[in-house]
Amino acid sequence: MKHYIIPFFLTFQGCPHRCIYCDQKAIAGEPAEEVASVMETFLKYHGSEDYTAEVAFFGGTFSLLPQKRQQELLESVIPYIGKKQVQGIRFSTRPDALDEKMLVWYRNRHVTHIELGVQTFQKKYLDLLRRGYPPQTARSAVSLVKESGIGVGIQLMLGFPGQDRGAFFKDIQEILTLHPDDCRLYPLSVISGTPLEKEYQNGEMNFISLETAVEWVADAVEVIEKEGIGIRRIGLPHSPELEEKIIAGLYHPSFADKVRFELLRRSFDKAGVGQGQTLVVHPADLQYTYRIARMKKKQIHVVPDSSLRRSTILIQQ
């Protein structure tokens, strides 16, 4: 059964201040006011399918919007939940913008998942990003959401100026320890018009290479998925508008593709795939498996199996 996320964007809405890296105008899509029209379009094309779906409010800081505004947005979705056309609501917010009372209120209004814009659990990088809270606030927020019965995701950055592999994997270990339902991994990019651009122009910032980022993230995804934690997204969403505004840091429109390819390449080599063998892989990994087989000049057969974990290759006997 296919699962859809129907996203709406609250550009900067509710944010107590602007983080150093952020330009949501370059990243955002449908405004939240278009809930009804977007839902009707979605149902027109997918209503006859066997599917599950969630409406998502991203961008901004949902839980710091005026409560009346939050209620309007949530209630705009509830009729579709009542008709079983949508199964729940998710939103993104800051770790320092939630408490137990709010979580009870959200749970009673069909919120099924909250993504926390943690970015990092390390003080020096939180200070660099001007997030305005200490690492323990992020840890506590993840635990608080989990205890409420609402699903929780963590958004994590990498590629800070001067960051090494050890520092990045301190953050990955935090994810493994806290064990959210899923996470997003995306590299820090310098976007034109952000406060980070000013700092970049005023001094030297050293960023890791694309090849290094792919290696780090492939290693991270491997251990995260082994622990049963989902990967919601790798890299920033691709858009021509965003590409035009990135002036430094890490960005590639096919970053996730490069990571997934690297993971399958490792599995292919480890499995010792021979000529004419039949491989069993997750359906999402079919394209990578065929690409690697062509690259290695191997004639193979591939069988998809959705019960397999991503990046796994089994040889059918």
Mark where each language-model region is.
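Canonical Radical SAM [4Fe-4S] cluster-binding loop centered on the CxxxCxxC motif
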Residues: 2-34
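Non-transmembrane, interaction-prone alpha-helical and coil segments associated with secretion
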Residues: 53-55
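Short acidic/His/Gly/Ser-rich catalytic and metal-binding motifs that mark active-site loops
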Residues: 15-19, 191-199, 242-244
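Conserved non-cysteine loop/helix-boundary elements of the Radical SAM core domain that shape
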Residues: 27-37, 45, 59-188, 192-214
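A short, N-terminal amphipathic alpha-helix
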Residues: 38-48, 218, 222
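Auxiliary Fe-S-binding modules of radical SAM enzymes
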Residues: 2, 202-317
